[in-house]
Amino acid sequence: MSAHDPHASLARPAAKAWHARLELGFERQPGGRTALAHRRHVGPLRVQRALYPEGDAICHAVIVHPPGGVAGGDRLEIDVKLDAGTHAVLTTPGATKWYKSNGLDARQRIDIDVGARAKLDWLPQNNLFFDATHASLEFVLKLGDGASVLGWDAAQLGRQAAGEAWSTGSVASFSKIVGPSGRALWVERARLDARDPLRAAPQGLGGFPVYGTLWALGPACTNALAESIAPALPFDDALRAGVTCIAPGTMLIRALAHSMEALQHLFAEQWLALRPIVHGIDAKPLRLWQT
């Protein structure tokens, strides 16, 4: 990416802000096929056609946002529902770029409902926050009885490839995972300001510009599993990771890094290792990752 990327200071007038919404619904058909039965979009947020590289039981779909990035005043809303017994793999083709603010916040809301005994692999590319971004992100995931989920969220502050630091701006985030009983299994609310000392503090980001969380959810996610993973996780000046089983069936791997490539590689490795345990299904690298 060039240091003269014209999107770095994109200031779209509020009247031209995008309000995009995408609804996806997966249902189980006779014979065990997972079908993308409901698909509705408003604005420039949509999904490419359903793919079946692993056979009919697992539906793969790629969510795309054609303009390529999110500017001040934009609102993105994604609602996903997996019916009982379905299995979906959702990803994105590239990083979501959050451009310099025009004075308005850019907002994203994602709501996912995973039905009983359904399986979800939520594998988006990372968020890339440009300098002077003002963004607000909300993520809510609901689990049905016997459901399992592997997914992640990763972010980078500033465009390192362009030599750009994240010196001004703010990112507000809210994440919530809700169990079958309706009880929250994990809730995290954070507001990160570019000038906050917490960015450099050991109890914060420790000076790392890249951070992320991988969550593994389901009956197989136990303290014993977390303890078996922990010794192999890196903890050095380039990449630091730790794992915790915060509640029965809820395991988190948190990571800090100096490069997004290193963090993505770690999360992809963990997904490949965890999928047979959490979903009971072998894993292969997504074809999209290899392009």
Swiss-Prot record:
It is found in: Cytoplasm. One of its GO terms (molecular function) is nickel cation binding. Keywords: Chaperone, Cytoplasm, Nickel insertion. Required for maturation of urease via the functional incorporation of the urease nickel metallocenter. It comes from the Bacteria. Pfam families: UreD (PF01774). UreD, UreF and UreG form a complex that acts as a GTP-hydrolysis-dependent molecular chaperone, activating the urease apoprotein by helping to assemble the nickel containing metallocenter of UreC. The UreE protein probably delivers the nickel. GO terms for cellular component: cytoplasm. It comes from Burkholderia thailandensis (strain ATCC 700388 / DSM 13276 / CCUG 48851 / CIP 106301 / E264). Its main location: cytoplasm. Belongs to the UreD family. This is Urease accessory protein UreD.
